[in-house]
């Protein structure tokens, strides 16, 4: 499923996608390997009734977030928004690939199978059922979490049957064998495609090197060896425990009263399997710094530099978000983009980002560059990082980043879809209901020294795990920095 792009500064809550978890606010971004193909295959079509409303998003406003727990143990966050006659609901389960155990790919397969069948309805009938009501269903699974979402008109004659079907899909899927085989084949085709994608190969290798035996090490999609071995019995067992009412956060936004919202939450949570929240995963061990190369025939080399970052509870979150925005999270004008692309023309783009998760997510820098200049470019990136850690941001850089945040921040609550993503993140990571205001206040009060101290506390050039993927070729010296670099970046990245 796809989501709107939102300001990079809220990384983690509104995150980037570098490692495989991301189309959801917060996870940074980590769009999983074969999951894009699955998402495309399973994306639902919008009826005109909702499509027309999508262009009429209400303006940003202060949120009055209400929260409670259902009798079954589901945590609910709700915001009334009566500007449009519709509502958005998102269920966030602690049912991502970090819960796969010895069956990598189990979480994403379970999630992908939710809307493939319920009693009396196959995948086509389910899709038609939502369409006939003007409703949208969406799903996805990532490192920490699995999602199921519903967008519906709020009128009772549309809302109630849409909720009934949604509750069946999420709570009582039948997991038909023919769909299971088809989705497995789609995933296996995705694994074959990965072999021709040096960027993906580098990403997979990086996560293994960075996380070792930790659950974050394996791709959310599993692999060509693990997926064929997964059985329907494993899906049913995983669904029974990971999709339990005690393991879900329900985010609701829209044209509903508190009474209606409570009834919806009760209906959905009572349809789920009974059970408690799953235990949180352990923190990863610090890996050894290393440099690793994957030989791949191409004109460019993919470079990934990473180390363990922070979890979502870290008190330095705001300072690191601001610091990364200046380093490489904000596109043109950042330290990395200025030195690597704008002055030397060595890359199409270079980006950095933290991906805070339940356990420590990665900090990562990624780029593609000309193969014959890959070694020099790698050293340049390391030098830029080292210099930034040594000097910190300038006052002007910090002031500019604060202004950018102040200007873009209202977009984070501009529509119901934006708000439901924020609520889901707040509930899943146990953030205070005042989180958005707190984050903005903390960010705007930061000093240069606070940003510098936070970046140095959590980052070190001596801890980098580096993976490159490309050909081994004779190296050329880098061009001197210039306002008009002689070496222009290739127009389009290879992968």
Where are the regions a protein language model picked out?
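N-terminal glycine-/lysine-enriched basic segments
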Residues: 191
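Short, polar/flexible loop-turn hinges at active-site or ligand-entry regions and domain interfaces
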Residues: 117-120, 170-178
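Histidine-acidic residue clusters that define the catalytic metal-binding segment
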Residues: 43-66, 208-248, 278-284, 409, ...
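Short segments within alpha-helical structural elements
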Residues: 458-462
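His/Glu-rich zincin catalytic helix
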Residues: 5-136, 149-154, 160, 164, ...
